[in-house]
Amino acid sequence: MIVGVGIDVVLVERFARALTRTPLLADRLFTEAERYTRSGNPRSPESLAARFAAKEAVAKALGAPTGLSWHDCEIVPDPDGRPWLTVSGTVAAAAVERGANRWHLSLSHDGGIASAMVVAER
């Protein structure tokens, strides 16, 4: 049963400027595993913007509760390279409160726009 659906879009150029203007912003928004590829290279602005859109989409799928920590929602590749969503702490508590225990995630970026769609199920 679907608990919620969230969709978000991010302008990549604007997001990249924000990351440049505020050097610690990436650390506040993303875990180390999100900021770097498996080989240790920094992720592209497009990739980070899509992950940020996913975090926003998760919050929307949960009804946009307050007090969620950015690090409590992590988007990293699964062994096959597909984006995988893991929740912990504040986000996991909000998910339990709403009965969400299964996630579907889609990320995309093209033409300067990054987007994400999340479906939360029980």
UniProtKB/Swiss-Prot annotation:
Substrates-to-products reaction catalysed: apo-[ACP] + CoA = holo-[ACP] + adenosine 3',5'-bisphosphate + H(+)
Main location: cytoplasm
EC number(s) recorded for this UniProt protein: 2.7.8.7
InterPro entries: 4-PPantetheinyl_Trfase_dom, 4-PPantetheinyl_Trfase_dom_sf, ACPS, Ppantetheine-prot_Trfase_dom
One GO cellular component term: cytoplasm
UniProt GO BP: fatty acid biosynthetic process
Source organism superkingdom: Bacteria
Segments passing through the bilayer: none
Annotated binding of Mg(2+), by residue: D8, E56
Pfam families, sorted: ACPS
Subcellular location, record wording: Cytoplasm
Class in the EC hierarchy, top level: transferase
One GO MF term: magnesium ion binding
Cofactors demanded by this protein: Mg(2+)
Keyword set, alphabetical order: Cytoplasm, Fatty acid biosynthesis, Fatty acid metabolism, Lipid biosynthesis, Lipid metabolism, Magnesium, Metal-binding, Transferase
Homology family: Belongs to the P-Pant transferase superfamily. AcpS family.
Biological role stated in the UniProt entry: Transfers the 4'-phosphopantetheine moiety from coenzyme A to a Ser of acyl-carrier-protein.
Annotated protein name in UniProt: Holo-[acyl-carrier-protein] synthase
Native source organism of the sequence: Salinispora tropica (strain ATCC BAA-916 / DSM 44818 / JCM 13857 / NBRC 105044 / CNB-440)
